[in-house]
Amino acid sequence: MKFMLGLACTAALCFVAPAFGQAAAVTTGKPAADQQLDGHYDLQNPFAKIIRGELPADKVYEDAEVVAFLSTNQKAPGHVLVISKTSQARNILDMSPADLTRVMLVAKRVASAERIALGADGLIVQQNNGAAAGQTVFHLHVHVIPCWNGKPPSFARVKSGQLDRKALAARIAAAMH
């Protein structure tokens, strides 16, 4: 059995560590085909819908190729996702070097903006590939999560009532310039 970020896994069984007061989820076998490293791009995934303007997002940056917005699952106030608008890459294995470079350059700018706007003492830059690695939306995305001294990073979701998402996005966006 191995343990990774809240998962206890054997070859065919994973237990997802629950948040306080919740029951553990158990999955067996392999994830669905489109949740593995190889699969088909789903045009109805939430990030594709954000790109098309079908879902709202608290954007901190956008250009013709990349958009960065607050994650709906805030691991810390200011947790931003950076995605390509031009690529239908599900994971890093599908992404062209040019598109990956553009996404990472914007992730770096977001990290700098979080440091300035939020006074972050540290930053987590994370990118997951496949359900086995914790990927839940199969459109390549990079997490940029601010951290502060004295407050160890938490992978528990920040309660939405604790955040003014629009104000937070505006602060980060202002520091992007």
Regions found by a protein language model. Name each.
Residues 2-6, 19-177:
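HIT superfamily nucleotide-processing domains
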Residues 9-13:
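Hydrophobic helical h-region of N-terminal Sec-dependent signal peptides
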